[in-house]
Amino acid sequence: LSAISQNIKLHTRVFNEADIKNSSIKEWNIEFLRLGEFQTFTNLQKSWDLVKGMNKSIGYPFFKVLIDSSHCGDSDLDMIENINLIQKIAKSDELGIFHASAPTTRGCLSSDDGWIGTLLSECVKTGKLKYALVEIFQHNDEALKPLRDLADGHGVDTTNGKNYDDLMLNGINDIARRLNNLTIRGF
């Protein structure tokens, strides 16, 4: 609870002192990380608790919950719990950007075990999703060694021989097709 109250104070202070309400900044997305990368904000519910508190402090839904499929998949909440939270977050007008990223590997989107398609669809169906981004990590990047050491499976080579430019382009095409298909089907 103290981490939430400290973050609320900090973000409210920045919001007020920088006069963000009167700036061109329309929203501020908050992302949670998996346990080990963060200690407190490690699932969608905890992230939303923070965002709700910050928005209450400033009086309107400026802060948004960033939905990252990889972090949702790596958290202690199952798919259904994440779906239910996405629906509630959207109803409160606090749904932010969607990160299409594969749990654990952070590699080729096809290694997501269903998390990307399911959560992206749920976000789209709320009618509140404005942006979706593709996020892929280079599995052998030395800067990511601490993450590889943190979790089994992180940094596994899921490239199938492709370079990262091609993986990213494939990911963007995949997400564009998914979004187009959801639109065609009326969502």
PLM regions and their residue ranges:
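Glycine/proline-rich, flexible active-site/cofactor-binding loop segments
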Residues: 1-34
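Histidine-acidic metal/acid-base catalytic patches
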Residues: 9-13, 17, 41-187
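Surface-exposed cleft-lining segments at the edges of enzyme active sites
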Residues: 1-4, 31-40, 71-73, 107-108
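Short, charged helix-to-loop "capping" segments that act as catalytic/coupling loops
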Residues: 23-25, 36-38, 58-61
